[in-house]
Amino acid sequence: MFNPLSVAIGLRYLRAKRRNGFISFISMASILGIALGVTVLITTLAVMSGFQKEIRDRLLQMAAHATVSAQGAPMHDWQHAVALAMTDPRVAGAAPYIESEALLQGERHQPAMMRGIVPNQEDKVSVLAQKLKVGSIDSLKPGEYNILLGKELALWLGVDVGDSVIVLLSQTQTTPVGTMPRMKRFTVSGLFEVGYNEIDRGLAVVNMEDMQKVMRMDGVTGVRLKLHDMDHAWDVARDLAVRLNGPYLVSDWTRENANLYSSLKMEKTVMGILLSLIIAMGAFNLVSSQVMLVTDKQADIAILRTLGLSPAGVMRVFMVQGSLIGIIGTLSGVIGGVVLTWNLERILKLIESTFNITLLPEDVYYITGLPTDMQFPDVVVITLMALVMSFIATLYPAWRAARIQPAEALRYE
């Protein structure tokens, strides 16, 4: 254990002026290196978490938390499925849907996901009505064959509200000239913008009854669910499938977008590993400064040994002194990281206004600010990692100090 004498001497060495000013400089560089590494790591991981949260929130504005769909055939009794889902207190809303891959033709062609909805039930599972820039969800009336397009999709197709688009579905039909894809001309009645390119450029929405007629389908693809807690999506969907007592397929938002979330998680992990090298550099500087301090304090060590301080006691002195440098650097970095994260948006705006530049163009990143989401577990892990690195960095110099023989050290004094 660290006895009071070791702590007292370690604190004295931390505050005392060195005969060699370079040692003081290296010690200060160690503190700054550790503090900088911790600050940058906390801020970067907060930004990465913020981007993950922003993407997830924008994606789930239009995507269901969970889906239950029929296996190999349409779901016919969807009214019963919706009613049964709403009896679960974990479910906030449920609505039927039809989905099919389609090719949309305007001035140009673009593949997209075609989704058939019930307009007066869609607000239970998505915010489509709030994301419409032009038009209304009420324009999707049965038999009128109107269509809502993502803003980017409409721009690519070269169409606007009032224009027509031809929809070719993946299902085929037999005609006198052979097998042809099912097609229908729809009128663009609205444009929506979620702020997520995969949706704004890859989704088209029509009335469910219109889509049933085009596809010659008397049922639906399945039921979409919105939950009070999206983390329970899989359990809720699975329970509903069991209660429906049929061959149903269950999916949730984590499985539908597994590649996206795994890549975001990997990016955060890799970024954390790379930036932790800054802390490692600070710890390496700590080793250098401690080794030079041991050399500078050889006479003091010899006197302490002569007065009865054991080699283990000498080792503890320098471990305390080095660990305190690590603690100061780590705590400074944590404070700096928290303050920087909280004020990052203001700093970004200040830089943009000062230099008259746009760091995050909205047309490229679909955001005007820098989202941050500081996670307490991330801060704890970074803090512990910095403290452990600092402690490990003190071991070798302290061990060297403990090996110094008093007679050898005092011979040249």
Curated annotation (Swiss-Prot):
GO terms for cellular component: plasma membrane protein complex. It is a multi-pass membrane protein. Its main location: membrane. Keywords: Cell inner membrane, Cell membrane, Membrane, Transmembrane, Transmembrane helix, Transport. GO terms for biological process: lipoprotein localization to outer membrane; lipoprotein transport. The chain crosses the membrane at residues 22-42, 269-289, 322-342, 379-399. It is found in: Cell inner membrane. Belongs to the ABC-4 integral membrane protein family. LolC/E subfamily. PANTHER family: LIPOPROTEIN-RELEASING SYSTEM TRANSMEMBRANE PROTEIN LOLE (PTHR30489:SF0). Part of an ATP-dependent transport system responsible for the release of lipoproteins targeted to the outer membrane from the inner membrane. Such a release is dependent of the sorting-signal (absence of an Asp at position 2 of the mature lipoprotein) and of LolA. This is Lipoprotein-releasing system transmembrane protein LolC. It comes from Xylella fastidiosa (strain 9a5c). The gene is lolC.
